[in-house]
From Swiss-Prot:
GO molecular function per UniProt: 3-phosphoshikimate 1-carboxyvinyltransferase activity
Organism: Caulobacter sp. (strain K31)
Broad class of where this protein is predominantly found: cytoplasm
Keyword set, alphabetical order: Amino-acid biosynthesis, Aromatic amino acid biosynthesis, Cytoplasm, Transferase
Pathway annotation from the record: Metabolic intermediate biosynthesis; chorismate biosynthesis; chorismate from D-erythrose 4-phosphate and phosphoenolpyruvate: step 6/7
The keyword Transferase is assigned to this record: yes
Record-stated family: Belongs to the EPSP synthase family.
Protein name: 3-phosphoshikimate 1-carboxyvinyltransferase
Keyword Nucleotide-binding applies: no
Amino acid sequence: MTAAGLKSTPGGPLRGTVRAPGDKSISHRSMILGALASGTTTVEGLLEGADVLATAQAMRSFGARVEQEGVGRWRIEGQGGFLEPSDVVDCGNAGTGVRLIMGAAAGFPLCATFTGDGSLRSRPMSRVLDPLARMGATWLGRDKGRLPLTLKGGNLRGLQYTLPMASAQVKSAVLLAGLHAEGGVEVIEPEATRDHTERMLRAFGAEVIVEDQGGVRHIRLPAGQKLTGTHVAVPGDPSSAAFPLVAGLIVPGSEVTVEGVMLNELRTGLFTTLREMGADLVISNVRESSGEEVGDITARYSRMHGVVVPPERAPAMIDEYPILAVAAAFATGDTVMRGVGEMRVKESDRIALTAAGLEACGVDVEEEPEGFIVHGTGQAPRGGAMVETHGDHRIAMSHLILGLAAQSAVSIDEPGMIATSFPGFAEMMRGLGGDLVEA
């Protein structure tokens, strides 16, 4: 893609079978855990987007040998820990990457300075830095811990920490810091969030104890853990699969299958919600890959209706609300999405940008402080807008999907950032029959 915009135009049905790109969360973690481990870690199916590649480069900065051996195939030679980097660690746009890396780095007697692109530098890091500081790490940076900042680690104390918000990133940062904390750590999670870190720590040889106490998850990582290199097969990313699948639901006559999608119940809230809206979504060929359940998902054009999305479902679909809002724009009735204030501190204020983009395309949207309501008419929205994405890849892809089924074309201003999570997005959609061209 070039610096030009990108335009999607309504056309005929979408048909075909595609494979979802590797899961972004697991790709980040495979790099970080591989660098922390002793010995060789091999990865297949890695998402080779800009965010994950920034994490790979960061691991090199901390002393790991990281090499690409083929498309999606990588080898990490870990040293059993992190060394002090000789230069600033630039994490690009990778919010997951920088938060998890800071947690891992806090366990070692080193000093590291982190920065990122303009979007990442605007995002607060205090939610991760606060528990790390309670464990004994120190940091120096801007208001609310915004990048750039310098972190000094080592000599960490154990910690029992109750998450003040549902955040897998904060949980993971504490667990990674706890690998080298005296006394280990316990994270108390009032609302369940994605559990990839717990699963992958076990795969690398760590003891992780998870208990449900009255509906509250307690995750304990005893002291003295050692990680050993392993093989990771990265499943398809459900957050990325959402885009071609929703396209299949809203473009008349379409049938789209996405193969190899991870079906972890803490990541599939969108699919549950779409089915409640009346979507024809069929999951088949369910199997296990590297400790995660995966399957193939087929979406057929559907006449959907509005629903009230339970706020407690938000952690299982927090990145999918923009594309859910697109589906809701074609549904009949109101789709109510509340309890999603976390969207305001993602790569952009996703509540505001989703509402603004849909309204520009003729959709009636009611924005609230902690969510929004889409008033669907059951008809294709007008479209015809140039949507400002503010550098947010999910806002960009969501509105391009809308344009494939709207009454007239929809353009977005900055397609380049789509590569952070879904390199090949435009090519995949064209392969299914979608009309995407430079604007």
